[in-house]
Amino acid sequence: MRIVGGRLRGRALAVPKSQAIRPTAERLREALFNVLVHGHGDPVAGARVLDLFAGTGALGLEALSRGADFALFIDDAAEARALLRENVAALGLGGVSRIFRRDATRLDAGRLGAGRFGPAHALAPFSLVFLDPPYGRGLAAKALASARAGGWLAPGALMVVEEAAKAAFVAPAGFDELERRGYDDTELLILRHMGEA
């Protein structure tokens, strides 16, 4: 598995040994970033990226390679965080990224929550959010609602949700669906955060 675009194009990413983590395939990542850049005014350049259910970090790392300013990776699985640390170090992106151990569906206490998230309270809201949860469990909608309630999202931020095509994803309140595209058994949805919670 490799970075498919930007200044780190072609660089290898560490991959999971188990089936518990399902990284976004290179072909799908390339299609996704083409849609963002050509269909949504390139929201990647200069973005503050939040990668929820980060796994290997492929989506957030791809965004950093393509000009994002900062990425915060959130995953509660030990294997995922180990892969994230390995990939961030191998790509030399430690200065523009952070990794948090957190349940992505429980961000509603807020990024400003009295030190509860450690250094997260000092982070500005995010302009581009990737969600690639385990398919078919309704976790993406829960995570979106939680991130919105917790103040993690900038007004007008773009959300990219990767879900099983058969899951019939419905965006929670506060999000406008901009686009829905099918790729084999996967569906990509692009949503816009409509403002404050």
Give the predicted meaning of each segment.
Residues M1-A197:
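Class I S-adenosyl-L-methionine-dependent methyltransferase catalytic core
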